[in-house]
Amino acid sequence: MLDVNFFDELRIGLATADDIRNWSFGEVKKPETINYRTLKPEKDGLFCEKIFGPTRDWECYCGKYKRVRFKGIICERCGVEVTRAKVRRERMGHIELAAPVTHIWYFKGVPSRLGYLLDLAPKDLEKIIYFAAYVITAVDDEMRHNELSTLEAEMAVERKAIEDQRDADLEARAQKLEADMKELEDEGAKSDVKRKVRDGGEREMRQLRDRAQRELDRLEEIWTTFTKLAPKQLIVDELLYRELQDRYGEYFEGAMGAESIKKLIENFDIDAEAESLRDTIKNGKGQKKLRALKRLKVVAAFQTNRNSPMGMVLDAVPVIPPELRPMVQLDGGRFATSDLNDLYRRVINRNNRLKRLIDLGAPEIIVNNEKRMLQESVDALFDNGRRGRPVTGPGNRPLKSLSDLLKGKQGRFRQNLLGKRVDYSGRSVIVVGPQLKLHQCGLPKLMALELFKPFVMKRLVDLNHAQNIKSAKRMVERQRPQVWDVLEEVIAEHPVLLNRAPTLHRLGIQAFEPQLVEGKAIQLHPLVCEAFNADFDGDQMAVHLPLSAEAQAEARILMLSSNNILSPASGRPLAMPRLDMVTGLYFLTTEIEGDTGEFTPAAKDQPESGVYSSPAEAIMALDRGALSVRAKIRVRLTQLRPPAEIEAERFPDGWNMGDAWTAETTLGRVLFNELLPRGYPFVNKQMHKKVQAAIINDLAERYPMIVVAQTVDKLKDAGFYWATRSGVTVSMADVLVPPEKQEILERYEAEADSIEKQYQRGKLNKDERNEALVKIWQDATEEVGQALRSHYPKDNPIITIVDSGATGNFTQTRTLAGMKGLVTNPKGEFIPRPIKSSFREGLTVLEYFINTHGARKGLADTALRTADSGYLTRRLVDVSQDVIVRETDCETERGITVTLAEKQADGTLVRDQHIETSAYARTLATDAVDAKGNVIVERGHDLGDPAIDALLAAGITEVKVRSVLTCGTGTGVCAMCYGRSMATGKLVDIGEAVGIVAAQSIGEPGTQLTMRTFHQGGVTGGADIVGGLPRVQELFEARIPRNRAPIADVSGRIRLEESDKFYKITIVPDDGGEEVVYDKLSRRQRLKVFKHDDGSERLLTDGDHVEVGQQLLEGSADPHEVLRVQGPREVQIHLVKEVQEVYRAQGVSIHDKHIEVIVRQMLRRVTIIDSGATEFLPGSLTERGEFETENRRVVAEGGEPAAGRPVLMGITKASLATDSWLSAASFQETTRVLTDAAINCRSDKLQGLKENVIIGKLIPAGTGINRYRNIQVQPTEEARAAAYTIPSYEDQYYSPDFGQATGAAVPLDDYGYSDYR
């Protein structure tokens, strides 16, 4: 077998009959499989041992040779080679066909490759192949031309003879008629008798004429057909063909079935055809040119590569190894077999029957019928159901053919090559483990013992607890006490991987150090739940064990959960306190007026109280019950850094540890600040979730990851501790209904009644009534909410939970205690009947019914969304899987401009709200210079929060940053253009698979995006706004948007004309060019609102000035139009902006760079318009890099470069158009991709990840990249010196570790003795 790590590319091509025979180890001649009595394979059958190898190791069929010592001998009795049985997985056989057959992929695929090659319509091809028509394969033009006059004379003679015969017959008949009439005349017969006789005679004469005419016409048809006879001409009429064959058989050759196709291909001159097609493309027009282009693609493929088109017609069919199509005995003596065996048997049966018929010399019609059946059986074997009715097995189930084994989710590619099962793994339910550190997980003892079994057994033998592995295994199975001690030792420092399905992003698998726990559930650290999207309501997780030292190192360094605190999508921490922890910290840092031990200033006779000399003293007071954690106190602090403003005021030279200052705060806040790293400024605020998030963000920017991990761990512990102390619980008594509710509802009820009356009287139409009612009840709900808010006490547990940001929101509180309000129907419109009850009071039957309406829609939506979002992720991964960081810097000068802030009219700067996802974590492309010309931040610097603050302070509003959109690296991207890796906070490493990270970052929040298209309700018939997931798909698939808005092709003034249904907009260009007219723009799409020069916003009106690319109506611009009008850079920025709008609407933060990676892949290709002196075909798609390289080469040689136009491809199309045929085939349309790749003899350079996973190589990303693969360890000087010192002769000198290791034991029979001879 080939070692996969030693080849660089994989080529696919057409196999010729000779190739098939070379692969084969023998011909399969019989359809038999296994002898049902002996259960041994039949000789020459589909499982024959002579062809495919022995069924048992080192044993021939007849049993003459048994044992490994006869290795390689071929038994003279049964002809079976003595070898391992596993050769039955790799040895192929073949079936010699009695008549050639065509390969269905090439004739039936769309477009038909055979049809394009031979220039035959698929319908005609089908007629020829399935014996419904003859085709002329060759014509001897010269011979026909030379002898045409002779043949014509012969034909004239034949015609003359027929005409003479006719004339003579007519003459004779006329005379007979005359004689008959005369006789009747003499007898004095009646006139009607005479008439009958005359009519009869005339009818016969007419028949004579017609018969002769038919014969003459037939001769004429034969003659004209013969004179115009040309190769590839179809003759459907069998009699005509026979006649031609009899008369002019020596001048032409014709046939039907695959044999005729084979002859046509043999006679086909590829070079001449390619030349003539190129000529047609240069000079032709319209349909003719288009067809020539399509045909040239196929013809040129055979012209340039080593493939012969003869491979599309088969003389032999390969038989795959029997172990790949096994036959298994079930209990009860029956057999289960792979469908392929049935399909092969049909082929063999028909083939054998055809051979017999040919030997017998059966009539042609019978032989042809059998050949047609053979063709159909081979078609079914290759691709069942592609043509006609599929071959079915028992129960009318279509049999799975070779193509079906590759296709789809259950096919070879996706089931076995891209998704494999792994050993050393287990799964169990998860429970929370609040006592764990961030990098730990609790592993149940039993599971750990099973996972680490081999390690434990080896260690037991090493420690002499067991004599050999077998007894060690027995000890483990009986769970002896020593086993647990050894397990503790083995498990130490050996990380395990935990994974929760669905793994939507890379944080779905993380490494932890296992801690043994009792019970059978895995314990999970509460802070990693966010990343795994896990909760403890019965979720399960899988455990995997990294075995090799390299795998363990990677798990520990790259995948340990404490090294994965930041989200790869936004670069912000994911391991944040949530739920209980937030509540606990919120409780701890709340300040309550008048609480026990509060600070009171000195009065006349009272000294001041609530002043403490140190936190320790305050804690003593707390322990004695003289102070509450939430009371305001004054305390002298020396170990905590003062806030920035106090530090600036009190310590102008900077604060040092031990400098004292007094804080007016609560003990709780002091305790909270003690959890933060030393030197972090004191935070004197109430900690709701937003503030906690901001602090952890800040920590992640300023401190090393290890400090952040320790801090969040401390916050977790404190959060749980104080949440327990706070006593926050929820009971029915905490749900308070506002007393004013009834009065509010009665007031609005009256308003609603008056609207209803107006509707009854016909003053309002239905839509207006609905709109008015919706408005009334929305106001009512709002007012009940206000009443609720003012009615609740501050310390109410529900309010505490909501205000702290732990979970829930005010709407939910209002639903519980106030009123539910209006709900929507499945269309997304409001039902104008409100739900007036709260859940505390209980809903009426009608209210409950209305409420279920919306709830059920929600559940159905979620299910659909999950599937859609998963498919979107799959397409994104496929399009971007080969984007890997390949070099440090591509040295480009280019970049994109991002806005940092907007200048207001008064000159102040307002920070751009999207700075987090646009400028943050990028590399500067040029120096950022302020108004005076001072460089604030240098080129090549990373923009973190401090750098952005410095730029804003210097008054800089926009900067030019590096971007993957402008990166100059050929395949993949360079580290500088990509910028900081969001997950590590440092410049991205070479080998990082940024494409996959981008796809996951966009796909993972996909489930949160809403499905529905929103309706702008109301009377004015607004267009649908497509939002959520459908909009993201529409953008990435580069589809024309549903409500497409025209964009201005040129800059200029507009003339707006309105009719009752349409707008007509004319743009008068500034440069005086031709006017651009947009006609028939529907008035349902409103005019676009524009920001005008004076800063006001209003609708587009007559006489306004528009810039090129500006949208004229509401709706979405068509990205293809943007590309045409404004070019590739603008369309990329447009797509990024539009995708971000959808995600931002849902409150999801994703960095622009991820979307840019995908968009870059959508614009990788160029359509060739004019090929110049290059090899490209006009109309074909080419990689931009390849296009530019070829053009440089041609220009250097003084030739004409090719002209191309950038194309925007949707992600599905771009995935299928990738250079890697393995990746494309495993994605979608497997047979089409493979057909195309085989014809073009495609070579896969194995540059992406998928291709390498499929063939089992290490992926070229991360530590699998080439530069990291051959690292050698060089000893340091000290180590070298130590190696030459004289060893001391102590006990360990004789230990087995001494000296050169002898390596693993080698089985004797594999050992080569050649060196010793």
From Swiss-Prot:
Sequence positions that bind Zn(2+) 2 = C890, C967, C974, C977
Recorded catalytic reaction(s): these are: RNA(n) + a ribonucleoside 5'-triphosphate = RNA(n+1) + diphosphate
Which GO molecular function terms does the record list?
DNA binding; DNA-directed RNA polymerase activity; magnesium ion binding; zinc ion binding
Keyword match Disulfide bond: no
Q: Which GO terms describe its biological process?
A: DNA-templated transcription
The entry's Mg(2+)-binding residues are D535, D537, D539
Q: Which GO terms describe its cellular component?
A: DNA-directed RNA polymerase complex
Keywords assigned:
DNA-directed RNA polymerase, Magnesium, Metal-binding, Nucleotidyltransferase, Transcription, Transferase, Zinc
What is its EC class? Answer: transferase
* Positions bound to Zn(2+) 1: C60, C62, C75, C78
Question: Which spans are transmembrane here?
Answer: none
An example Pfam family from this entry, by short name, is RNA_pol_Rpb1_5
Which residues are connected by disulfide bridges in this protein?
none
Give the EC number(s) listed in the UniProt record.
Answer: 2.7.7.6
Instruction: Please list the cofactors this protein needs.
Output: Mg(2+); Zn(2+)
Can you quote the record's cofactor note? Answer: Binds 1 Mg(2+) ion per subunit.
Q: Spell out the InterPro entries in the cross-references.
A: DNA-dir_RpoC_beta_prime, DNA-dir_RpoC_beta_prime_bact, RNA_pol_asu, RNA_pol_N, RNA_pol_Rpb1_1, RNA_pol_Rpb1_3, RNA_pol_Rpb1_3_sf, RNA_pol_Rpb1_4
Record-stated family? Belongs to the RNA polymerase beta' chain family.
Functional summary from the UniProt entry: DNA-dependent RNA polymerase catalyzes the transcription of DNA into RNA using the four ribonucleoside triphosphates as substrates.
On assembly, the entry states: The RNAP catalytic core consists of 2 alpha, 1 beta, 1 beta' and 1 omega subunit. When a sigma factor is associated with the core the holoenzyme is formed, which can initiate transcription.
Q: What is this protein called?
A: DNA-directed RNA polymerase subunit beta'
The organism of origin for this protein: Mycolicibacterium vanbaalenii (strain DSM 7251 / JCM 13017 / BCRC 16820 / KCTC 9966 / NRRL B-24157 / PYR-1) (Mycobacterium vanbaalenii)
